[in-house]
């Protein structure tokens, strides 16, 4: 029978529930179990697709095209699994489904209420996640903080699940904070006690408490937490600050978290073999080289907006024993006069995805500098589009060339709406989303990277290269090295007479793994290292 683990958070947000859940998932997978994982977000948006990155950080896209919380990126990278649309559920999605059922008459004229209709729909999403993936264990992270009004239906639903499937098949893990008061020189357990009290008032008794702390906690303090929260002292797990996120699974294993879980859920499985993971952590902590990548974007004040890009760069760096230093550059501040100073000492330049006109001219200026100065360049999504616009303007001489998204009246719409997007009015969930095939041109840098004729990558875009300009650009030396199998859509562009200048319409950052870097990121970092004469 499928087992269910629920991870909740208390005291404050951003305690690392997602990393805790991901790390546990990795440990259980390495015990030979089939694990899936999901995130419940209490906000009323249907998904984060239309939310500002400043509000929510990166939007992570799954193979089946779901626009999801950035925690799913952590889940995929840690556990090395591909998730689906059932892995991220929001209040908005739940209510939308229930209201559609009510309009269809599915409730036979009954009064639709939070209990049982909303809670039943939430429970259905938990059970469906396990059924769709044939999982031995489903890990569900509940977003927000215990005590928030928005989280109550989710907490009630996971309380009911224990009755539905039996206490031996459900486990509750609560993440809390033990703050250190510098003035008093003391750590305080009272916030944790009150958070657990709040959780218990809702009918949920945690089986494990993961204590987030910046200072080591004593056994006496663990015993105190265990006494007041009514759990075994061995079930108080310390989660201190880590040098690298990837060491956290090993820290949790050392404290026996996975053994506690297997014992409680009566899972008969082998010990987790973490030797490969230990080698990864050893490598990460002992990198001997450094490469600097200038990341030119519009949301650089919030690095979480590009978290998968940065992690993918790091994964690529690990393959070459290199520590990646990201130089954050606000695209709005880039001009012809200062671009050289801004990207000074950068071994490579990366322009990531984005929407809207803010910072676009700065990105175009950056691309021009990378092209002319022969600096390794990697463009992603909008990064590919601005690379195409820059070439049209400055090599073909098409003055005023632009994207129809930014300048609808441009005489040369190098980037235009996808044909199927012409009559769409809604912004949410209407992009070209998810995994699509890309056919590569033999002999190209893209082909060298993938060593494959057809590859599959995840997309999130509405605009595409305009084929009216394809022949003209090709004749001027622009290489279309990746297209959809029918040749209709441009997926990858590159330049011949350049050390490494490649840009993709898709988002390769969503498929990178710490032990298996994504091919284009790997070759971009390799080219950056070679250029800096560090390899």
From Swiss-Prot:
Domain Glutamine amidotransferase type-1: 292-534
Active site: 381, 507, 509
Activity regulation: Allosterically activated by GTP, when glutamine is the substrate; GTP has no effect on the reaction when ammonia is the substrate. The allosteric effector GTP functions by stabilizing the protein conformation that binds the tetrahedral intermediate(s) formed during glutamine hydrolysis. Inhibited by the product CTP, via allosteric rather than competitive inhibition.
Pathway: Pyrimidine metabolism; CTP biosynthesis via de novo pathway; CTP from UDP: step 2/2
Presence of keyword Cell division: no
Single GO cellular component term: cytosol
Record: residues binding Mg(2+): 71, 141
UniProt-listed Pfam families: CTP_synth_N, GATase
Keyword Protein biosynthesis: no
Gene Ontology terms describing biological process: 'de novo' CTP biosynthetic process; pyrimidine nucleobase biosynthetic process
Region annotated Amidoligase domain, chain positions: 1-267
Binding residues for UTP: 13, 188-193, 224
Reactions listed under catalytic activity: UTP + L-glutamine + ATP + H2O = CTP + L-glutamate + ADP + phosphate + 2 H(+); L-glutamine + H2O = L-glutamate + NH4(+); UTP + NH4(+) + ATP = CTP + ADP + phosphate + 2 H(+)
Binding site for CTP: 13, 148-150, 188-193, 224
Binding site for ATP: 14-19, 71
Function: Catalyzes the ATP-dependent amination of UTP to CTP with either L-glutamine or ammonia as the source of nitrogen. Regulates intracellular CTP levels through interactions with the four ribonucleotide triphosphates.
Alphabetized HAMAP family for the sequence: PyrG
Entry-linked PANTHER family: CTP SYNTHASE, CTP SYNTHASE-RELATED
Protein family per UniProt: Belongs to the CTP synthase family.
Oligomeric form and interacting partners: Homotetramer.
The protein, known as: CTP synthase
Originating organism: Bacillus licheniformis (strain ATCC 14580 / DSM 13 / JCM 2505 / CCUG 7422 / NBRC 12200 / NCIMB 9375 / NCTC 10341 / NRRL NRS-1264 / Gibson 46)
């Amino acid at each position: 029978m499928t087992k269910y683990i629920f991870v909740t958070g208390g005291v404050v947000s951003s305690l690392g529930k997602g990393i805790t859940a991901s790390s546990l998932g990795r440990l259980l997978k390495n015990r030979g179990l089939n694990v899936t994982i999901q995130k419940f977000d209490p906000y009323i948006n249907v998904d984060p697709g239309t939310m500002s990155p400043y509000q929510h950080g990166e939007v992570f896209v799954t193979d089946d095209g779901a626009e999801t919380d950035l925690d799913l990126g952590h889940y995929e990278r840690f556990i090395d699994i591909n998730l689906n649309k059932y892995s991220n559920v929001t209040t908005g999605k739940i209510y939308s489904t229930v209201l559609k059922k009510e309009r269809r008459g599915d409730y036979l004229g009954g009064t639709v209420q939070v209990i049982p209709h909303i809670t039943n729909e939430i429970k259905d999403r938990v059970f469906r996640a396990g059924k769709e993936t044939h999982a031995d264990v489903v890990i569900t992270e509940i977003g927000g903080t215990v005590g928030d009004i928005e989280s109550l239906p989710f907490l009630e639903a996971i309380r009911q699940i224990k009755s539905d499937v039996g206490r031996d098949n459900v486990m509750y893990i609560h993440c809390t904070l033990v703050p250190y008061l510098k003035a008093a020189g003391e750590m305080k357990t009272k916030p944790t006690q009150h958070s657990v009290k709040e959780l218990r008032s809702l009918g949920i008794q945690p089986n494990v408490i993961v204590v987030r702390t910046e200072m080591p906690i004593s056994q006496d303090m663990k015993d105190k937490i265990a006494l007041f929260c009514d759990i075994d002292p061995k079930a108080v797990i310390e989660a201190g600050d880590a040098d690298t996120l990837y060491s956290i699974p090993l820290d949790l294993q050392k404290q026996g978290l996975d053994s506690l879980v297997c014992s409680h859920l009566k899972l008969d499985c082998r010990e987790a073999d973490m030797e490969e993971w230990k080698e990864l952590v050893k490598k990460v902590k002992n990198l001997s080289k450094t490469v600097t990548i200038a990341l030119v974007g519009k949301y650089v004040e919030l690095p979480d907006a590009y978290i998968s890009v940065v992690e993918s760069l790091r994964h690529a760096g690990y393959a070459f024993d290199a520590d990646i230093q990201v130089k954050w550059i606000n695209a709005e501040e880039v001009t012809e006069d200062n671009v050289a100073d801004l990207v000074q000492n950068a071994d490579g330049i990366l322009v990531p995805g984005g929407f809207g006109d803010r910072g676009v001219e700065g990105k175009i200026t950056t691309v021009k500098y990378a092209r002319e100065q022969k600096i390794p360049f990697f463009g992603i999504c909008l990064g590919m589009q601005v690379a195409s616009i820059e070439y049209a303007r400055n090599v073909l001489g098409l003055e005023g060339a632009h994207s129809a998204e930014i300048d609808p009246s441009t005489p040369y719409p190098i980037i235009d709406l996808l044909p199927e997007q012409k009559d769409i009015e809604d912004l949410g969930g209407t992009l070209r989303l998810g995994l699509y095939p890309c056919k590569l041109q033999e002999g190209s840098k893209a082909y060298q990277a993938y060593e494959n004729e057809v590859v599959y990558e995840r997309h999130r875009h509405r605009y595409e290269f305009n084929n009216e300009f394809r022949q003209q650009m090709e004749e001027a030396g622009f290489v279309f090295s990746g297209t959809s199998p029918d040749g209709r859509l441009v997926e990858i562009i590159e330049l011949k007479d350049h050390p490494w200048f490649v840009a993709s319409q898709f988002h390769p950052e969503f498929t990178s793994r710490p032990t298996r870097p994504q091919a284009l990121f790997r070759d971009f970092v390799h080219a950056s290292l070679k250029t800096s004469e560090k390899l």
